[in-house]
Amino acid sequence: MTEKLKNSKEVIAYIAECFPKCFTLEGEAKPLKIGIFQDLAERLNEDEKVSKTQLRAALRQYTSSWRYLHGVKPGAVRVDLDGNPCGELEEEHVEHAKATLAESKAKVQARRKEQAQKAREEGKAKAKPAANKKPQQPRRTNKPKVQKPTKPVETRALNADEITVGNAVNVNMGKGNMAATIVEINKDDVRVQLANGLQMVVKAEHLRA
């Protein structure tokens, strides 16, 4: 089964390959014969790669491109699919192309201006809070203080159902217990977070209530 072309860009490339004397992909485009869609539809009627709907959309894109509109100028001659001349352009068509081109360029310029303005505003918004910040003091490289174990208090071993993430526990440090919160459980290994923010991995048997 023949694979259909996916988008107008592919369709334009395909018809330029089929009719190189009429359609071009680079340089100034030639004005097309009035009613050329019908000619295209008839010539590609049996072609499974492209549908009439795709042809119509591709032609619309091709004839509204700046490259094509630049080619619609006084003295230019329309061509058919085989590159044969089909009459000189009428003045009203030239004027229409000129107006369309100017309008299209104005829209692009306005859009670029709007995007540039937006980028400037975003840049100012980011710079303003930074300017208001006080100079940061040099960070000290001292190691974080480890919380000293508290004096032994009367505790008991945890039951299995008490070893759950988020539970407040005491960690038996030998000389005393340290308050902590369970953050992760991996079989017998339990990761806890001490009150000072430090995390450590201990055996479940070292946890007390």
Curated annotation (Swiss-Prot):
<feature type="region of interest" description="Disordered">
    <location>
        <begin position="101"/>
        <end position="155"/>
    </location>
</feature>
<comment type="similarity">
    <text>Belongs to the ProQ family.</text>
</comment>
<protein>
    <recommendedName>
        <fullName>RNA chaperone ProQ</fullName>
    </recommendedName>
</protein>
<feature type="compositionally biased region" description="Basic residues">
    <location>
        <begin position="136"/>
        <end position="148"/>
    </location>
</feature>
<dbReference type="GO" id="GO:0033592">
    <property type="term" value="F:RNA strand annealing activity"/>
</dbReference>
<keyword id="KW-0143">Chaperone</keyword>
<keyword id="KW-0694">RNA-binding</keyword>
<dbReference type="Pfam" id="PF17516">
    <property type="entry name" value="ProQ_C"/>
</dbReference>
<dbReference type="InterPro" id="IPR016103">
    <property type="entry name" value="ProQ/FinO"/>
</dbReference>
<feature type="compositionally biased region" description="Basic and acidic residues">
    <location>
        <begin position="111"/>
        <end position="125"/>
    </location>
</feature>
<dbReference type="GO" id="GO:0010608">
    <property type="term" value="P:post-transcriptional regulation of gene expression"/>
</dbReference>
<dbReference type="InterPro" id="IPR036442">
    <property type="entry name" value="ProQ/FinO_sf"/>
</dbReference>
<dbReference type="GO" id="GO:0034057">
    <property type="term" value="F:RNA strand-exchange activity"/>
</dbReference>
<dbReference type="InterPro" id="IPR035236">
    <property type="entry name" value="ProQ_C"/>
</dbReference>
<keyword id="KW-0963">Cytoplasm</keyword>
<dbReference type="InterPro" id="IPR023529">
    <property type="entry name" value="ProQ"/>
</dbReference>
<dbReference type="GO" id="GO:0005829">
    <property type="term" value="C:cytosol"/>
</dbReference>
<dbReference type="Pfam" id="PF04352">
    <property type="entry name" value="ProQ"/>
</dbReference>
<comment type="function">
    <text>RNA chaperone with significant RNA binding, RNA strand exchange and RNA duplexing activities.</text>
</comment>
